[in-house]
């Protein structure tokens, strides 16, 4: 076979005719309707909120921290003095009772003394348990502030300290096992303080936040249904108070607070103070019309509207309790709002007209 000689390099001239200027002279196609496609007409949602109504709902969201009162107030001094006097009165009455029983019979006196010692031991145990619960709640509040400060300053050492405290609080919660295991593997890694706080919030608190949303929604649904079927307003108020108190306690237990009786009272006071900072607690007919607009209020009957109002109030109390008992502030995760629950509450208390009467 003979080898072919390579072609010598040469130059070529590009013709300007390739631009096809005649394409620009073509007339545009006339618009015409397409009739062979199925046209789907969107049906408006009668319970959908407008942007203005949703913005008004978000105003109710308690996203501010209630200021803590420091020092001794007159009410604390009064109740403290009364408590000391009552303790002295109980002690003197117990002593007189034991002396009187000893004067009657020795075995009665010794029995009364033993019962008094048992009662005193049980009282001391209750006081210690309440103090431990109060200390646990205080540690959660301090951890919340430390985490916010570490994330703001991007301090890695402070962030690791806050994350370690969060892991110790969540050690007994099975929902956080996977997140704690992930953070255990990052002990020797170099991570920025803000990113470490966000990672701990995502991996540890996200399952708890999901469960907290479920608790708030279920409590709001129960309040809404009971309000809609109860014959007396007093029953509505009593059930709202009962359900709100149970919701506050369950949310605190969910995040590892486990409050006692005194701890629950202090926690409830913080939640009420938290709500007082962000607005009024009571929501009447005029307030709910300002919140969700006159359109939604006119779509529901009076009793069903009251159910939605009480359900929203319960949801707002739950969100405020979530803000108070959550160890870390909302940073990486989205904070729940009133608008996240109103759709479910409305669906419970009323059906859409097209679903209720499909033939009309």
From Swiss-Prot:
The keyword ATP-binding does not apply. The keyword 4Fe-4S does not apply. Residues 1-30 are annotated as: Disordered. One of its GO terms (cellular component) is plasma membrane. It is found in: Cell inner membrane. The chain crosses the membrane at residues 77-97, 108-128. InterPro entries: DUF697, UPF0283. Keywords: Cell inner membrane, Cell membrane, Membrane, Transmembrane, Transmembrane helix. HAMAP family: UPF0283. Belongs to the UPF0283 family. NCBIfam families: hyp_HI0043. This is UPF0283 membrane protein Oant_2119.
